[in-house]
Amino acid sequence: MKDKLITLEEIKEAYKKLKTHVYNDSFNLRLRTKLADFEYDKDIELLFEGLLYDINNDNIDKYLSKISTYILPKKVPSKKLGNTNIVRNDVCGFFDDIDLTEEDYNFYIDAPIEIYLIDVLWMMKEGFLLIDSQIKNDCYGNSLVFETNGDSYGIKHGHYLFERYFDKYQKWRDNGIKIAREQTQHKNDVLLVCLDIQRFYPTSLIDFSKIQETLQSRNSDLFLTGILERIYVSYQNVLDEVNRRKSKFPQLPIGLLSAGIIANWYLSDFDKEIKERFNPIYYGRYVDDIFMVLGNVKPNKNEDWFDEKFLYEEGSPLIPEKVIDNNNEENKRYKLRSHSNLYINSQKLKLFYFAPNHSLAILDNFQKRLDENSSAFWFLPEDDANETLNSIGFDIIYDDTINKFREISGIKNSKYGVSVFLTKQIKKEIICRDNANTSLKEDLFKYFTGNRLIDMYSLWEKVFTYFVVTNDTDAIRKFENSICKQIDLIKIKDCNTNTQLIRNSLQKHCTYCKNMAMALNYDMIDDIELMDLPCKLRSTYLIRQHYTPFPVIIYTDSKINNIISSDIYNELLTSDNINLTIIQVAPYINPRKIHAHEICLINLFNYIKNFSDTHSSFDSGKLIDELITYDLCSDINLSQCKGVKLENNDKQEVDIPKTTCKSDEFGNAKQQIKVALSNIKISNNDLISAIKGAPILNSAKRERHFHLINLSTEEKVDCLLLPEVSLPKELLVTYAEHSRRKQQLIIAGIEHIVSYNKCFNFSVVFLPYIHKGNKEVFILPRLKNHYSPDETREILKYRKQVPTLSPSIYHLINWQGVQFTVFNCYELADVLHRSLFKSKIDIMFAIEYNKDTCYYSNIVEATCRDLHCYFIQANTSDYGDSRLSMPKRSVEMTPVKIKGGDNDTIITFTVDIKSLRDFQRQSTLFQNKEDFKNTPPGFDHDFVSQRDSR
């Protein structure tokens, strides 16, 4: 027996990377389903040990024999109705058949999970060495995540194999545009060149002897490379049998992750030739798409100018050829000199010339469109009467001006637009279902019809999901039947075998799509025999977790059929059958990182369910320890210590724990913070309903909060402040995700939460930070110390109880160097409690639902000067007095103050932390009263420096 070449830990690492990739992939549902079946209810360690033995003993024939293939459409070609000048909206359903040629579909590898694991192991152990510095610089697609620390070179340990697709694609495109702009600003001519290799994967020829040669030159083992070659050859034999031909070399298998790495290496010599011949100021390749920028190049009027200048000389990397197409017309294509099997269609060669003294309108409008598309994912979905499926789902093609109807020459489908639109509708319906869009169902069936239904097969899952979310079983059946009917119309020219194969493949894909949707709500499954696959997908954590209102619930033992119900929060807090303990899942089983805010919320709900007046404090110190265990923070990020503990005249204890929150690479403290002060109206009816234990979350309230979040994103604020009892508990995850992604501090009051007859009023602070390159947010809730008399009467009126804290608790928080505390409305009336923060804070935030603005205005002004800090408070807009106040003379004290209005909005301002601290560091005698009021007697100047936590 050979020495052990692969270890069990390496197989676990490979499985973790494979599962994470599959989880984040929105396309390959067949592999996702295979993975769920492979793992579900199995002793997975035993499976790994079996694979370990087979690999190390070169016993993989049993896996190779199970390799097969399936076919999915690449595109559905549009048909024309002869020589007609009629523009029709029913062309997609006008023809009886859907005819496909070789250009219109792709073969995909279908193999046992063990094959995919060997594939990833090869990348981890040997394949990564194919990627040199040139490939790293030139290639933006399939970019491996390399270890950046220390002297080791290899793929980084953790969940991810590749860098995020969206980020790399954006860089590939934006870097070229940026350089082109810079050249025009320097008065240089610029030529943008876009190339696309025709059918790259299917026409590639991979010679593994050259791969071995490259790896040997870099001191790599070749054991796994030999196994990988057998996988590629076995798959090629399957393709050759299907297509009745014999290949000398295997092609790149679509569906194997290693193909992306080998593809980048395979074309690296072509990259080098192109750069040497064209000398571009920017060159980038995304798989088979090439984008380069040439400087100081000015085309002439000759149609063949580009070929004459760059391609007719000896040694050109592209060789022009004349070809006759299917319509017996002569066309041009370009053969790659380094790979004579690869071609670039002349129609895919695009040149864009920009003279520095002329308009850059094309570049500007293209960039604007890109920005609009990318920003679609920055904002939460708001209702827009003008945004319908019909307006989003089509792009109108004009011959001339858009103002004349006769200039319309046609329409084309917008797959991207429909995808974004459906995602928005799904999210809105999950959060609130008070008025499902009945017209959308009709529009969906009108849109997904005819050959367009097949062309949009990648969106089937989203349509099924929408119908599951809206509990529409009839629509699910109807949509499935429509798909089946259209699949039966597909024909592949001159190949009955492939016709049957693509039909079977699409039928399976339809089943996978439906089951992915059903896994979100078992109540939609009316046949127990159909529970198998949805149950496997959910149990292995491979569902679309981002759709669920409380994603971490699937990591508990809770048995909840419908995990996309917005009512899930009420169940969490009132049901004894729901266990809110996170199951310890092996890292290689969990396809995603559980975030800090999810653990925080689990702890909050457990605190509420298990609340005891005799032992009532929320143990955030224990929570921080738990986060450290999950590697979601370190003592660099979050720390807690007892700040103050004293007794007032009534012998009541007051406890002030201090929480420090900052990012790993925290530099200087924030000198200023930009604050968004909300101006929203809190409905008294909503308040009373929440106290009764029947909170209202309708579309209007959802829209209000989405709008506020989007405004804060648009304004790029550091902090968002909302009033008391303004935040529905159902939106806690939404706000936490926003705070995490945008690294935005959020302070708000949660609507009253009733659990076991106790009525809780919480303030909550979302504290974002970065840990090991990952964005996280720590949620710090605090139960109100002093319920107001009016509030207490309402609670007792409806036979609920007021929970009491002993001792009273306030938080002293240092976030990124800014030190503050939060008071919840009636707490401000306690002068002793306010005084505890003298010298200790830069800002006092106050959240209120308060009619008595005159009284509280006096408190604000007194507190602002007595504590010598900024005072920022948010109240419901109908009572007003939301404001920023500063310890300055009266005419300058309150530069921001808002009240009233019908629309919900925010007002932003910048709070200068540095200037206040610089002033407070000075001895009172030397302070300039033009800047701020003098610090009050007893102010501890030494405390100022302690606020800057570094």
Where in this protein do the model-derived segments appear?
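Conserved two-metal-ion catalytic palm core of "right-hand" nucleic acid polymerases
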Residues: 1-223, 448-450, 491-498
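N-terminal, active-site-proximal structural segment of metallo-dependent hydrolase catalytic domains
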Residues: 26-44, 618, 625, 632-719, ...
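Conserved polymerase palm-domain catalytic core
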Residues: 177-287, 291-305, 343, 351, ...
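C-terminal polymerase-core module
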Residues: 297-446
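CN hydrolase (nitrilase-like) catalytic-core segments centered on the catalytic cysteine
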Residues: 537, 541-556, 721, 726-752, ...
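C-terminal beta-strand edge segments of enzyme domains
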Residues: 550-660, 862-863, 875-950
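Active-site catalytic loop in hydrolytic enzyme cores
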Residues: 629, 633, 637-668, 758-839, ...
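Active-site-proximal beta-strand elements of phosphoester/diester hydrolases
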Residues: 672-694, 781-783, 818-827, 845-848
